[in-house]
Every structure is written in structure tokens, then in C-alpha cells.
Curated annotation (Swiss-Prot):
It is found in: Secreted, Cell wall. This protein is one of the different antigenic serotypes of protein M. Protein M is closely associated with virulence of the bacterium and can render the organism resistant to phagocytosis. GO terms for cellular component: extracellular region. The lineage of its organism: Bacteria, Bacillati, Bacillota, Bacilli, Lactobacillales. The keyword Cell division does not apply. This is M protein, serotype 32. It comes from the Bacteria. It is a peptidoglycan-anchor. GO terms for biological process: phagocytosis. Keywords: Cell wall, Peptidoglycan-anchor, Phagocytosis, Secreted, Virulence. Belongs to the M protein family.
């Protein structure tokens, strides 16, 4: 379950 990681990556990219 790396959904949080993916969301965090998106936020970090922003």
C-alpha cells in the first residue's frame, strides 16, 4: 500500500 507515498510524491512535485 504505497498510496500515501504516491500522493506525497505528487505534493512534493508541486
Amino acid at each position: 500500500n504505497h498510496q500515501l507515498t504516491q500522493e506525497n510524491e505528487r505534493l512534493t512535485q508541486k
